[in-house]
Amino acid sequence: MAVDESMIGFDGRLSFKQYLPHKPTKWGIKVWEIADCSTGYCLDFDVYTGKAYEQASPNGIGYDVIRKLTEPYQNRGHHVYFDRFFSGLPIMEYLKDHDTYASGTIMTNRKGLPKALKKKKLAKGASAFYSKENSDVLVTTWKDKKQVNLITAGSL
């Protein structure tokens, strides 16, 4: 399964209409969506209604979205993929504790990541990995054209 944001095109007036310049449909209603990776079928979605969407938890809106959309699929051994907006140590540990594997790109400035990861300068083609003691969460970093950071939980 994969979680991402999606845009439903809408030209009318709406208090929570969004503009996403990197999407093919730039103006419309933003939704968080969970889809099946093999079929592309949308399994569930949640409409984002702006800052008043919901009171975000201390772990952030990305954590809340993943938790809400994956709830029916937890404790079944599924694997969820998402991008750096949603990634963080708390959501990875939460999903691992609920028998759900997870993988995604991650920014080096997220809480709980080793400081060495931020400072690590790799030569092209080189890689490194970090793991928290007594944890099934692994952070891998490698350099292609740019440095890429990937976090995965439970699938070690």
Language-model regions, residue ranges each:
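Acidic, contiguous segments within the catalytic cores of piggyBac-derived transposases
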Residues: 1-156
